[in-house]
């Protein structure tokens, strides 16, 4: 049989890379920043790293729930925008964010009210429990923006605009390293200064992403979408 070469559509390949590369780059940066922050946390002893691990395990439940909504947003928003149904696409985004709000009411309340219950699930070490309890109580103030940020990533991806939120997320996340160094040496709060840095950067990034959403930066201009649909 004759051999044939694949016929690449470079136009669509470019669109795929434009949507996917920012997200891939962000994942790499997040890993590198955590590698840089880990020695700072470890300077407070093994119990500090253990407490962070407990916090991340519980937060992963919130992340998993919001990731499901985020993936649904990507499909439904892209479908509706492609069909020229902008109002339906925006309604989908707003509905997903409202569900995220209800989900995170539970996590914010439980992180603040019963952090000791979460900590006791994983360890009986009193020092690790104390550090984990501080983590949950401090991070609770930004938990809604943590979940909403996951939803907003999906909303922007559905609108083929992954670059704006990725830039915000990468910059805010990268700032954690110098801010952790500064907070540890100037705030005299010990390990809590690192947890506070995590909270502040999540809050700032979430507020900026929300502002971009309400400014309709999550999709291409309507006239451009109409041309693509035509």
What are these regions (language model features)?
Residues 23, 27, 35, 39, ...:
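Transmembrane alpha-helix boundary and packing residues in multipass membrane permease domains
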Residues 175-184:
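Transmembrane alpha-helical segments of integral membrane proteins
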Residues 5-36, 61, 65, 69, ...:
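Hydrophobic faces of transmembrane alpha-helices in multi-pass small-molecule transporters and flippases
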Residues 67-70, 139-158, 164-176, 193-210:
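Short runs within selected transmembrane alpha-helices of multi-pass transporters and secretion channels
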Residues 1-21, 77-142, 184-230:
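Short alpha-helical transmembrane segments in multi-pass integral membrane proteins
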Residues 28-61, 79-80, 117-126, 186-187:
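Helix-terminus/linker motif at the lipid-water interface of multi-pass membrane proteins
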Residues 38, 51-115, 146-168:
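Small-residue-rich hydrophobic transmembrane alpha-helices
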Residues 47-48, 162-163, 190-191:
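Membrane-helix interface segments
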